[in-house]
Amino acid sequence: MQGSVTEFLKPRLVDIEQVSSTHAKVTLEPLERGFGHTLGNALRRILLSSMPGCAVTEVEIDGVLHEYSTKEGVQEDILEILLNLKGLAVKVQGKDDVILTLNKSGIGPVTAADITHDGDVEIVKPQHVLCHLTDENAAISMRIKVQRGRGYVPASARIHSEEYERPIGRLLVDACYSPVERIAYNVEAARVEQRTDLDKLVIEMETNGTIDPEEAIRRAATILAEQLEAFVDLRDVRQPEVKEEKPEFDPILLRPVDDLELTVRSANCLKAEAIHYIGDLVQRTEVELLKTPNLGKKSLTEIKDVLASRGLSLGMRLENWPPASIADE
């Protein structure tokens, strides 16, 4: 194994041991010393906290007003039933939330297989027990809301302003969206030729059956790679804030007086006084204009009316006039 002293080893062996449909062991080697813990801990945290999945978030049980109660003919109390519902493994295709229904009567266990659902929903563990009915006349009816999410979201975090509008009897459930039930990693020694200081990463994990363990690790690695992309080329990814520069003067003030369409007599009088722009004109007062040769009161009235129609008037004060664009002409 020859190479540059600065060159890092890349894993060449990936072994996947499928213990069961929900349990797998993944071995990755060789890794440079220390990278076993670096990658193992990062993948473990992502698998536990950031994997998307579906979970029960709300439940309505006929005859039950709150979670601190019991139901006649049912062995478990309501809190225990809610706890069992948290363990319900559900796969939902193409939807972010669905409503499932359950109706069961007679003595015996109530399982996930008793839940009624459409073709977009799959109950992964139909044998999962929700409660037990202890009387021939006992019955239980539920409406179960399943939502898509990520990580763990307690019911208290979903209580907001609409809480007061929530119907009595609708029970909130702590939502554990992550399909990963258990994850552990171990770093063992590995050897390549003469090097004996290398790492071998062994990841062992169990899921609830809604995702294949191999696929879960693949997704976690993808999430990690996407988050690290920003460090590959360290640039400020924030978009620069574009500040709109407000013009120093109203654009109409920069237009020539010819745009006012005054009579020939009035226009010629203004040009004789070097009044070429509307900004020049509005700074003049009535007294100043009346001193202009050949400009009488009739022309003054015309000018005032035309300016008023554009929201302007005589005698205005303009700081820093004329602007550089005009002064240079």
Swiss-Prot record:
Describe the family membership recorded for this protein in Swiss-Prot or TrEMBL. Answer: Belongs to the RNA polymerase alpha chain family.
Q: Does the keyword Transferase apply?
A: yes
Q: Give a GO biological-process term.
A: DNA-templated transcription
Q: What is the protein name for this chain?
A: DNA-directed RNA polymerase subunit alpha
Which Gene Ontology molecular function entries are recorded, alphabetically? DNA binding; DNA-directed RNA polymerase activity; protein dimerization activity
Q: What class of enzyme is it?
A: transferase
Q: Reaction catalysed by this chain?
A: RNA(n) + a ribonucleoside 5'-triphosphate = RNA(n+1) + diphosphate
Which gene specifies this protein's sequence? rpoA
Pfam families linked to this entry: RNA_pol_A_bac, RNA_pol_A_CTD, RNA_pol_L
InterPro entries reported for this sequence: DNA-dir_RNA_pol_insert, DNA-dir_RNA_pol_RpoA/D/Rpb3, DNA-dir_RpoA, RBP11-like, RNAP_asu_C, RNApol_insert_sf
Among the entry's GO cellular component annotations, what is one? DNA-directed RNA polymerase complex
Ranges annotated as spanning the membrane: none
Query: According to the UniProt entry, what is the EC number of this protein?
Result: 2.7.7.6
Q: Which UniProt keywords apply?
A: DNA-directed RNA polymerase, Nucleotidyltransferase, Transcription, Transferase
Q: Which Gene3D superfamilies match?
A: 5' to 3' exonuclease, C-terminal subdomain, DNA-directed RNA polymerase, insert domain, RNA polymerase, RBP11-like subunit
